């Protein structure tokens, strides 16, 4: 591989939207939506269902990227996959993604 380029991009977000007010109720925290937004800029976030890991979400994103690029998994030389919330310390989430996506 002499040149690398981005053929397609994809993303996946879990369907469960959790607002700051939801968090406050869920965890009984003594704060407000405004306090959280003022300090973090975050108004809502997405939570994955139990048992859904980053490699599962990455698989959906990879499928979208491949469809956008008109490619098949076997056409790829490399998938660049980074996460701050891996499901496992070892092996890396990319190894799980590769296994789920196939050769």
Residue spans of the language-model regions?
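Conserved "HGTGT" condensation-loop signature of ketosynthase/thiolase-family condensing enzymes
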Residues: 1-80, 99-102
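Short Gly/Thr/Asp-enriched flexible loops that form oxyanion-binding sites at enzyme active sites
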Residues: 85, 89-99
């Amino acid at each position: 591989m002499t040149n690398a380029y981005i053929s397609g991009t994809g993303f996946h977000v879990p369907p469960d939207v959790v607002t700051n007010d939801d968090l406050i109720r869920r965890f009984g925290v003594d704060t407000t939506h405004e306090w959280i937004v003022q300090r973090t800029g975050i108004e809502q976030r997405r939570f994955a269902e139990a048992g859904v890991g980053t490699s599962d979400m990455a698989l959906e994103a990879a499928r979208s990227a491949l469809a956008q690029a008109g490619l098949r998994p076997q056409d790829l030389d490399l998938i660049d996959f980074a996460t701050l919330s891996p499901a496992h310390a070892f092996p890396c989430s990319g190894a799980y993604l590769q296994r789920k996506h196939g050769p």
